[in-house]
From Swiss-Prot:
Subcellular location per the Swiss-Prot or TrEMBL entry: Cytoplasm; Chromosome
Protein name per UniProt: Archaeal histone A2
Species for this entry: Methanobacterium formicicum
Quaternary structure annotation from Swiss-Prot or TrEMBL: Homodimer or heterodimer with another histone. Dimers then assemble into higher oligomers, with the DNA wrapped around the protein core.
Gene: hfoA2
Functional note: Binds and compact DNA (95 to 150 base pairs) to form nucleosome-like structures that contain positive DNA supercoils. Increases the resistance of DNA to thermal denaturation (in vitro).
Length: 68
């Protein structure tokens, strides 16, 4: 089961144009977001370490997204 709250995930799908969404679809998107988010976070941590910092900044996340 995904750790992300399901209601906001459902809103993301609705904002994309869906009228109805199954619970399985919400769970699947939540799982995918978590997996992708964790990979981006790992890249951002490495970028922060490379810059000599322990703190991950927004710029690290942005660079991780661009390099993905």
């Amino acid at each position: 089961m995904a750790e992300l709250p399901i209601a906001p995930v459902g809103r993301i799908i609705k904002n994309a144009g869906a009228q109805r969404i199954s619970d399985d679809a919400k769970e699947a998107l939540a799982k995918a977001l978590e997996e992708n988010g964790e990979e981006l976070a790992k890249k951002a941590v490495e970028l922060a370490k490379h810059a000599g910092r322990k703190t991950v900044k927004a710029e690290d996340i942005e660079m991780a997204v661009k390099s993905a």
